């Protein structure tokens, strides 16, 4: 039976009911009357998975018969969220399944809410990877993700006394019905050990990696369903286990811990995402994780290639590997090692294959985010890879000096090895040198990569550098997250936008239609009322759905400037209670996002948000017109509730710091207006929607760079010379937001007035003025609705389908099959 026939057979309420009941009985071994909501979810998910299996096998067969070139996307993060609703939607079974469960006395929405988010990522990096996989499958392209099957993910965030607390995220505690275990395709991964020279008759150097220990990578596949079921690709996730035998003799002597020591050490590799690198053990574990991902993926890629090929002559014509940020940069050394050590290729041939196969996406302009590892750690953990990296660097150094003779300073800047008291391996440089393509993720970002981050490399290889502006999948972020708006759009312009987002342009002719505006506003209000219930359940704070929902949800980081948002809140609060000037319009300030466990300043900013909220929300003088809420444990499923309800999208990073951002695209797609700096993709959003339909403020990236270079920025002058700035900072320092912990936020005052690394005070006056404009225009419902509809109509450029097509044509050279 083909997948189409299988879906047709299932495309009936009774058929799906029977499948769910069968899995309740034969998979869960339960009577229907004993089923919990979680049980119903599991039975339903397995029934849906049955429908996917034929599609997975048929898709794989189609790709293999065509001997199509395939993309392998390596990423430490894949933030896929929940899968049941998404899979039903893409299969066209959502309404049928809803009715099937309703007839069984169960609400599908309640069932979907029991599914845990897959804890396989943290922020935009992982969500972008998930959007790309969705687009690849929808476009029918052979593209597969490779990642780590984290047992706990990053962490579950709880808020205690205003502070972030990290708890384990047991997302797989009850198993995942979407993971198809593949123990027969497990692979052996060598690690540690030492290098020996093996003599040979050819008098060449033949290094042998010996005395290594072993990790075993066990894969599980998560199906990725393309819209309409045209193709079902997969995300392959690896768990780490040890090959060490359980030592029964030690166990019998009573030392259980020692008996399982090796197993536990290996399994740590796939326990958590991003273990803290503030201590040596954490750094070693991170390096092991990155190597584990790369080595497992490489073995599987080679296994797939060898199904149709016996030599490596066509490897770059059949295989494209994309490194998503620097975490998989070891792919360069690992592919070289495999080609040279395991397949006896000469260096030059192996290098030609490697560079023709690999592409690298850079996601940052923060130098500290371009990973570096101590060479001493490399030598202990991956001695053969360090040898190969030294050889790559030696040959690269000769190339640099041939082009720029005697320019030792340039060579120092470009070298993979950072010399100093403690040698470091620069992973970003390794990725650039080993790839044929290096791309940024927004026009400004790509420009700054070549002019500011790695200008020497751009001068050497200008043809390698290109831009691929990020995108998001409209199927999850509009069709699934905002079904009422999706139906309104369908009635106006049809449903072709689901697979070609440019069709939303047709909404422009509806932007001033009174009836359309009324329905658009009604849908936004329903979404706000739903979010208000979520906020109350999560925080205990009741908010007014008629207020402006002013939203900033993203990873907590100083450059993203949640602090600037808080300074505006403090300004409005102090102005109201001290001067009696109330805000023009009621606002609910919504925050969400996680801070890295070791990032003290970011965690203190979370505390500040909650402390300000505690004061504002309990002050009867203002709490009818101001509320501040921090929703804990931000994740994809929560974003799907927040984004459709937002009126105002805060995209306020310091110009020149945000690579792209994708939240900005999701909010605009759902009819929120953006207040933001000219940074990342905000610039391109402004170009698309028109400057009259976005609220831009603040310094430009080039202005900030000039001030840095000339050291002309004096935040104290803003404090002393601007009464509004002074009033806000004095309130911050006065302990009125930390009465129980005096002096708690003094460091923020000192930081802002002292050096203000992220230019908060320079941008604050412009930000406050722009927020006043927002308040005035929100009070003009017709104008606001017009702008919001225009935003939705003009986001066609920001579909991940467009992004993936550009990668496919310009970098990967893959096609739909």
Predicted region positions:
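A conserved ligand/cofactor-binding region detector
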Residues: 1-817
């Amino acid at each position: 039976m083909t997948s189409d026939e299988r879906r047709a057979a299932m495309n009936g309420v009774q058929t799906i009911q029977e499948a769910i009941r069968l899995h309740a009985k034969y998979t869960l071994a339960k009577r229907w009357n004993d089923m919990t909501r979680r049980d119903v979810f599991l039975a339903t998910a397995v029934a849906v998975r049955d429908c996917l299996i034929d599609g997975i096998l048929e898709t794989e067969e189609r790709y293999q018969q065509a001997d199509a070139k395939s993309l392998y996307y390596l990423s430490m993060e894949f933030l896929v969220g929940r899968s049941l609703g998404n899979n039903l939607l893409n299969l066209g079974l959502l309404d049928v399944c809803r009715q099937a469960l309703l007839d069984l006395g169960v609400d599908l929405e309640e069932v979907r809410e029991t599914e845990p988010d897959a804890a396989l990522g943290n922020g935009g990096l992982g969500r972008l990877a998930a959007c790309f996989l969705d687009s690849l499958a929808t476009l029918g392209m052979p593209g597969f993700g490779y990642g780590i099957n984290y047992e706990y993910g990053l962490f579950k965030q709880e808020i205690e006394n205003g502070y972030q607390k990290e708890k384990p995220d047991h997302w797989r505690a009850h198993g995942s019905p979407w993971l198809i275990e593949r123990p027969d395709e497990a692979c052996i991964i060598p690690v540690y050990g030492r290098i020996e020279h093996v003599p040979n008759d050819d008098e060449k150097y033949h290094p042998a990696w010996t005395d290594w220990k072993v990790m075993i990578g066990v894969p599980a596949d998560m199906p990725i369903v393309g819209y309409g079921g045209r193709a079902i690709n997969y995300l392959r996730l690896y768990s780490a286990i040890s090959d060490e035998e359980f030592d029964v003799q030690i166990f019998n002597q009573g030392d259980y811990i020692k008996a399982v020591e090796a197993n536990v050490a290996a399994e740590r590799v796939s326990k958590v995402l991003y273990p803290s690198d503030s201590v040596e053990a954490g750094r070693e574990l991170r390096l092991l994780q990155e190597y584990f991902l790369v080595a497992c993926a490489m073995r599987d890629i080679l296994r797939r290639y060898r199904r149709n090929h016996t030599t490596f002559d066509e490897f770059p014509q059949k295989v494209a590997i994309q490194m998503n940020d620097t975490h998989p940069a070891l792919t360069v050394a690992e592919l070289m090692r495999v080609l040279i050590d395991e397949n006896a290729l000469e260096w030059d041939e192996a290098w030609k294959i490697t560079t023709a196969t690999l592409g690298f996406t850079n996601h940052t302009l923060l130098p500290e985010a371009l990973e570096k590892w101590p060479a001493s750690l490399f030598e202990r953990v991956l001695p053969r890879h360090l040898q190969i990296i030294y050889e790559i660097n030696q040959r690269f150094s000769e190339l640099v000096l041939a082009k720029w003779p005697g320019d030792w300073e340039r060579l120092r800047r470009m070298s993979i090895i950072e010399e100093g008291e403690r040698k470091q391996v620069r992973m970003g440089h390794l990725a650039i040198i080993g790839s044929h393509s290096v791309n940024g993720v927004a026009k400004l970002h790509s420009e700054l990569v070549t002019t500011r981050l790695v200008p020497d490399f751009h001068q050497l290889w200008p043809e390698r550098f290109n831009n691929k502006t990020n995108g998001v999948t409209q199927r999850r972020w509009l069709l699934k997250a905002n079904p009422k708006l999706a139906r309104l759009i369908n009635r106006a312009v049809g449903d072709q936008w689901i697979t070609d987002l440019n069709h939303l342009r047709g909404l422009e002719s509806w932007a001033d239609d009174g009836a359309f505006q009324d329905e658009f506003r009604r849908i936004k209000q329903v979404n706000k009322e739903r979010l208000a219930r979520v906020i109350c359940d999560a925080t205990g704070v009741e908010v007014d759905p008629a207020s402006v929902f002013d939203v900033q949800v993203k990873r907590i980081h100083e450059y993203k400037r949640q602090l600037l948002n808080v300074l505006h809140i403090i300004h409005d609060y102090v102005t109201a209670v001290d001067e009696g000037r109330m805000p023009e319009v009621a606002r609910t300030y919504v925050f969400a996002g996680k801070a890295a466990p070791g990032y003290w300043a970011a965690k203190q900013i979370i505390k500040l948000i909650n402390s300000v909220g505690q004061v504002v929300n309990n002050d009867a003088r203002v709490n009818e017109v101001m509320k501040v809420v921090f929703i804990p444990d931000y994740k994809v499923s929560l974003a799907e509730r927040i984004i459709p309800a937002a009126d105002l999208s805060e995209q306020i990073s310091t110009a020149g710091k945000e690579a792209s951002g994708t939240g900005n695209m999701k909010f605009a797609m759902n009819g929120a207006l953006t207040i933001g700096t000219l940074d990342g993709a905000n610039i391109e959003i402004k170009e698309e929607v028109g400057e009259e339909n976005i609220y831009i403020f603040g310094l430009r990236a080039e202005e900030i760079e000039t001030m840095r270079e000339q050291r002309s920025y004096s935040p104290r002058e803003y404090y002393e010379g601007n009464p509004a700035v002074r009033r806000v900072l004095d309130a911050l320092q006065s302990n009125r937001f930390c009465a129980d912990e005096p002096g708690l936020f003094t460091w923020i005052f000192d930081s802002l007035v002292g050096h203000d690394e992220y230019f908060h005070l320079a941008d604050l006056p412009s930000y406050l003025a722009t927020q006043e404009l927002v308040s005035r225009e929100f009070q003009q419902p017709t104008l606001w609705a017009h702008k919001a509809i225009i935003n939705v109509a003009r986001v066609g450029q920001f579909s991940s389908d467009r992004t993936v097509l550009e990668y496919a044509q310009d970098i990967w050279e893959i096609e739909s099959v």
